[in-house]
Amino acid sequence: MKATIVTVGDEILIGQIIDTNSSFIAKSLDKIGIGVHEMLSITDDKQHILQTLSLLQNKVDVVIITGGLGPTKDDITKKTLCEYFNDKLIINEKVLVHVTQLIEDYFKRPITQVNKDQALVPSKCEVLFNQVGTAPGMWLQKENTVFISLPGVPYEMKYLIENEVIPKLIAKYDRPFIIHKTILTYGVGESLLAERIETWEDNLPKFIKLAYLPSPGRVRLRLSARGVDENVLKNEISLQVQKLQLIISDCIVGFEEDETLEVVLGKLLTEKKLTISTAESCTGGKIASTITSVSGSSNYFKGSIVSYATEAKVAVLGISQEKINKFSVVSTQVAEEMATQVQKKFKTNFAIATTGNAGPNKGDANAEVGTVFIAIATPKGVFSEKFNFGQPREKVIDRALNQALEMIYKEILKNYSK
């Protein structure tokens, strides 16, 4: 089965907003065995919409359209669907009652004609009732293709996908099983990783596909199996993961689709009842922000000091001015003292510290752009490493973040997890 996702709206095409709807819809369809053939973003133009619908008819099984269902004049999706299906708009009484109640309860005013028009739907459509908004979804079919129109507001779209669209698609179609397993790796680049697992990859069964999903400091390996026997797929995926672990056990840190290193680190710290703090310069608090993005992180993360300026390192962290003058603020010595001092201040088992030059200029320390020192304070002492993450500034910060998390994770796993 194949599907196409169409987002309607000039605001997407001019870069004013980011299309997050397509990603959510694609993931939802993939979970029930419907593959997305393509994603399209088109203008708020009637002819463009009509042309797109015509091109997709009988090309794919399902077309999901988001956007253009609002109350303003530039929201033309409903009228255009009527033209394409040779239909007319009628009032849906259930939707009208819902819209009226919503306006009166939440906005404390009478309903206007513009609001009433939200209850207009093509007479041939099956209405997908939108409990969390005013614009209903619509389900239409022409020959072999189902067309589903949804509001562009993300939380309304998500509600309709989860509560209306997915259940109806499951009931309508026989679909293959699709099993995914994602392996999270750190510390090895994509090309080197590919070399290490080349033989294993070449011997994968034909019904299992491997995808490399790289990002700064990490590579996710996604195994996808498609077939009619779910148990066979699960067993084969499990077998292949076991084989992979024997090859790259040194850089695997997790196995879940949405699991990140900060989540894995949090689980490890929680399990071992350990605590952590950070002292950040060039990363500007990003390490602390990432660690605390995980629910329950207050159990192991005690605090952070962002000592960006040299005077803050001296006044707040207590780094000696003599040491800075002798070795430079971007140095092993300063990084290690930052980690040691913040560990003491927050009384934590571990601490991370960063100091460096993210660019674009050399700065007062005269360090090369991209130079970062990362220090880890442990119950047994402190150590640090020097890196050069190149340019641009955003890349330096992201790579320093990932490297710091990897260093602390591996240190705890290696020396403190028994």
Curated annotation (Swiss-Prot):
This is CinA-like protein. Pfam families: CinA, CinA_KH, MoCF_biosynth. Transmembrane segments: none annotated. HAMAP family: CinA_B. Signal peptide: none annotated. CDD domains: cinA. Belongs to the CinA family. NCBIfam families: cinA_nterm, molyb_syn, PncC_domain, PRK00549.1. It comes from the Bacteria. PANTHER family: NICOTINAMIDE-NUCLEOTIDE AMIDOHYDROLASE PNCC, NMN AMIDOHYDROLASE-LIKE PROTEIN YFAY.
